[in-house]
Amino acid sequence: MLKKISFKKLELKPELENKNESTIIPCAPKELLLICPKCKKTLLKSELADNLDVCRECGYHFRISARKRIGITVDNETFVEYDRELRSKNILNFPGYDEKLKTAIKENGENEAVICGIGKIEGFECAIFAMEPFFMMGSMGCVVGEKIARLFELATDKSIPVIGFTVSGGARMQEGIMSLMQMAKISGAVKRHSNNGNLYVAVLTDPTTGGVTASFAMQGDIIVSEPDTLIGFAGPRVIEQTIRRSLPDGFQRAEFLMERGFLDSIVGRNELKKYLGNILMLHNVEAR
């Protein structure tokens, strides 16, 4: 039930105040509204959720959790999660890492920055992973790499496609070189999956950067992106500081990359499930 909207009197300067009138403005609770960062319009959170967290005014795609991503993409009651119990450890005794992990687990309710499993999309069975942007910015550590590599190996054994939703700030610095090794490990699993004639569709969401972009995010047979997704290795500011030149408008955004052949398609969130279902159908995946 919605809370009763409160009002407060607008304080006016003496020279502007009308003795016979009082002015009031609505003061809505913060839990009901938010501001779109792109068009600056005020949005009802309930209406935004009904539209899959896409702004109806400008089409801005808000970031969503991995659990919600799977919920809006996979057919009801078909998803079976794998390796949920795996958790990262502070193998390098990096200062503050244990506390960051505990906080991330408590705030997100997830054990790691990726969810992996098998389900159906429009009736077609596939392996699915979705990275979690709210768990240490979707950073890739040993457990993230292990879970995704295991999923590709499982998909290879079952001869089913993989649909992967990427969102990440890159390799997890608290795990040092071990996090970078996950790039090679996952890439090897992707290659074996491909060598067996299986399909891999990578869906890039905002932002997909760092070691994730430099490995499995760009290894898909078909590479799709949501609109206006930031895709790159180093960030724009780092590049500008390095080359000491201004970057072109839209640099590293999905539309910029699409024009230059790095992407196969840009698909809005509302159309994505149907789009993926059509791809699975066209690649002769048996519906069950």
UniProtKB/Swiss-Prot annotation:
Broad class of where this protein is predominantly found: cytoplasm
UniProt-listed InterPro entries: AcCoA_carboxyl_beta (IPR034733), Acetyl_CoA_COase_Trfase_b_su (IPR000438), ClpP/crotonase-like_dom_sf (IPR029045), COA_CT_N (IPR011762), Znf-ACC (IPR041010)
Gene Ontology biological process terms from the UniProt entry: fatty acid biosynthetic process; malonyl-CoA biosynthetic process
Keywords: ATP-binding, Cytoplasm, Fatty acid biosynthesis, Fatty acid metabolism, Lipid biosynthesis, Lipid metabolism, Metal-binding, Nucleotide-binding, Transferase, Zinc, Zinc-finger
Annotated metabolic or biological route of this protein: Lipid metabolism; malonyl-CoA biosynthesis; malonyl-CoA from acetyl-CoA: step 1/1
UniProt: Zn(2+) binding residues: C36, C39, C55, C58
Top-rank EC class of the record's enzyme: transferase
Note on how the cofactor is bound: Binds 1 zinc ion per subunit.
Alphabetized GO MF terms: acetyl-CoA carboxylase activity; ATP binding; carboxyl- or carbamoyltransferase activity; zinc ion binding
Record field: catalytic activity: N(6)-carboxybiotinyl-L-lysyl-[protein] + acetyl-CoA = N(6)-biotinyl-L-lysyl-[protein] + malonyl-CoA
The CoA carboxyltransferase N-terminal domain, residue ranges: 32-288
Localization (cell): Cytoplasm
C4-type Zn finger ranges: 36-58
Cofactor: Zn(2+)
Pfam families: Carboxyl_trans, Zn_ribbon_ACC
EC number: 2.1.3.15
Keyword Transmembrane helix: no
GO cellular component, one term: acetyl-CoA carboxylase complex
Quaternary structure note: Acetyl-CoA carboxylase is a heterohexamer composed of biotin carboxyl carrier protein (AccB), biotin carboxylase (AccC) and two subunits each of ACCase subunit alpha (AccA) and ACCase subunit beta (AccD).
Known function: Component of the acetyl coenzyme A carboxylase (ACC) complex. Biotin carboxylase (BC) catalyzes the carboxylation of biotin on its carrier protein (BCCP) and then the CO(2) group is transferred by the transcarboxylase to acetyl-CoA to form malonyl-CoA.
Family note: Belongs to the AccD/PCCB family.
Record protein name field: Acetyl-coenzyme A carboxylase carboxyl transferase subunit beta
Organism: Ruminiclostridium cellulolyticum (strain ATCC 35319 / DSM 5812 / JCM 6584 / H10) (Clostridium cellulolyticum)
Lineage: Bacteria, Bacillati, Bacillota, Clostridia, Eubacteriales
The encoding gene: accD
